[in-house]
């Protein structure tokens, strides 16, 4: 009777330890999977500060992926009277067609929209308060609509630039760095800056903005 009691206690203790070990193993397994998922997710979303990280492995993959957005781009380009090729070029260079791209400066999605700048500006122009959420900007249709609307705004802002190729590059640089940052490289006066730009060829304009020369080459369309 005494031995049976000891046996039962030891058996229960054994079962308890076995259950604990099992739960511990399951917990470790879940933790390991979670770490792998988070690591992959962070690699998928994040980019380096100075160089956009392409999620896709080669240009062929990127171009195939860009085809996914052709219909949205065509519809949105027609809506805002913006060249489809310009939109595609920005998507290609800014995100490689990855709708979940996110930079450390909080530029989001296919056209790398910053909620606090381009996003808020487009909202203001459309009579809306606030700014788009990050989740909204991960949606390809919303992202392309806001990005193209912002390009349309820049087209109107630079309408006085006579050379259309130069105007296109001015729009691209302003899209990436901001209008004020672009114009201030020429003059503190907006009018004077535009006058200087109007004396330039596409090549001399790109030479002037040396820090954006590589981007200009990427955007040749």
Swiss-Prot record:
Record GO cellular component, one term: membrane
EC number in record: 4.2.2.n1
Gene3D superfamilies per record: 1.10.530.10
Gene Ontology molecular-function annotations: peptidoglycan lytic transglycosylase activity
Catalysed reaction, written as an equation: Exolytic cleavage of the (1->4)-beta-glycosidic linkage between N-acetylmuramic acid (MurNAc) and N-acetylglucosamine (GlcNAc) residues in peptidoglycan, from either the reducing or the non-reducing ends of the peptidoglycan chains, with concomitant formation of a 1,6-anhydrobond in the MurNAc residue
Stored PROSITE patterns: TRANSGLYCOSYLASE
Keyword flag Lyase: yes
Record key words, sorted: Cell wall biogenesis/degradation, Lyase
Keyword DNA-binding: no
One biological process term in Gene Ontology: peptidoglycan metabolic process
Enzyme class of the recorded protein, top EC level: lyase
Pfam family, one: SLT
Sequence similarity: Belongs to the transglycosylase Slt family.
Annotated function: Murein-degrading enzyme. May play a role in recycling of muropeptides during cell elongation and/or cell division.
The protein's name in its UniProt record: Membrane-bound lytic murein transglycosylase E
Species in which this protein is naturally found: Buchnera aphidicola subsp. Acyrthosiphon pisum (strain APS)
């Amino acid at each position: 009777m005494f031995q049976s009691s000891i046996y039962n206690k030891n058996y229960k203790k054994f079962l308890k330890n076995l259950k604990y070990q099992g739960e511990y193993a399951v917990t470790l397994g879940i933790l390991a999977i979670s770490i792998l998922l988070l690591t992959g997710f962070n690699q998928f979303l994040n980019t380096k500060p100075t160089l956009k990280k392409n999620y896709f492995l080669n240009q062929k993959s990127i171009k195939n992926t860009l085809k996914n957005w052709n219909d949205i781009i065509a519809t949105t380009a027609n809506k805002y009277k913006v060249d489809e090729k310009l939109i595609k070029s920005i998507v290609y260079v800014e995100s490689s067609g990855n709708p979940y791209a996110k930079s450390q400066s909080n530029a989001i999605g296919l056209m790398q929209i910053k909620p606090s700048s381009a996003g808020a500006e487009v909202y203001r122009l459309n009579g809306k308060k606030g700014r788009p959420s990050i989740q909204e900007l991960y949606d390809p249709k919303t992202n392309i609509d806001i990005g193209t609307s912002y390009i349309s705004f820049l087209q109107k802002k630079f309408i006085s630039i006579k050379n259309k190729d130069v105007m296109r590059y001015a729009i691209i640089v302003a899209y990436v760095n901001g209008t004020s940052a672009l114009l201030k490289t020429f003059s503190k006066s907006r009018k004077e800056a535009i006058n200087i730009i109007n004396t330039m060829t596409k090549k001399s304009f790109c030479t002037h903005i040396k820090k954006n020369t590589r981007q200009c080459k990427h955007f040749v369309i």
